[in-house]
């Protein structure tokens, strides 16, 4: 009887632990956007675009010579 009680308690513990791991919302899966922080920096994008444009113009000038 004692072994059966311990076994049933162990099984209950395993089921509860599995449920807690399976339904933990803090990790795994896709997370909903909680903060609407923009990761886009328009000034940096404009600076990169301008640098690429300048290098392209310089490359074209070198090809003409």
Swiss-Prot record:
<dbReference type="GO" id="GO:0005576">
    <property type="term" value="C:extracellular region"/>
</dbReference>
<keyword id="KW-0732">Signal</keyword>
<dbReference type="Pfam" id="PF06377">
    <property type="entry name" value="Adipokin_hormo"/>
</dbReference>
<dbReference type="GO" id="GO:0007629">
    <property type="term" value="P:flight behavior"/>
</dbReference>
<keyword id="KW-0372">Hormone</keyword>
<keyword id="KW-0527">Neuropeptide</keyword>
<feature type="modified residue" description="Pyrrolidone carboxylic acid">
    <location>
        <position position="20"/>
    </location>
</feature>
<feature type="signal peptide">
    <location>
        <begin position="1"/>
        <end position="19"/>
    </location>
</feature>
<dbReference type="InterPro" id="IPR002047">
    <property type="entry name" value="Adipokinetic_hormone_CS"/>
</dbReference>
<keyword id="KW-0165">Cleavage on pair of basic residues</keyword>
<protein>
    <recommendedName>
        <fullName>Adipokinetic prohormone</fullName>
    </recommendedName>
</protein>
<keyword id="KW-0873">Pyrrolidone carboxylic acid</keyword>
<comment type="function">
    <text>This hormone, released from cells in the corpora cardiaca, causes release of diglycerides from the fat body and stimulation of muscles to use these diglycerides as an energy source during energy-demanding processes.</text>
</comment>
<dbReference type="InterPro" id="IPR010475">
    <property type="entry name" value="AKH/RPCH_hormone"/>
</dbReference>
<dbReference type="GO" id="GO:0005179">
    <property type="term" value="F:hormone activity"/>
</dbReference>
<keyword id="KW-0286">Flight</keyword>
<keyword id="KW-0964">Secreted</keyword>
<dbReference type="GO" id="GO:0007218">
    <property type="term" value="P:neuropeptide signaling pathway"/>
</dbReference>
<keyword id="KW-0027">Amidation</keyword>
<feature type="modified residue" description="Glycine amide">
    <location>
        <position position="28"/>
    </location>
</feature>
<comment type="similarity">
    <text>Belongs to the AKH/HRTH/RPCH family.</text>
</comment>
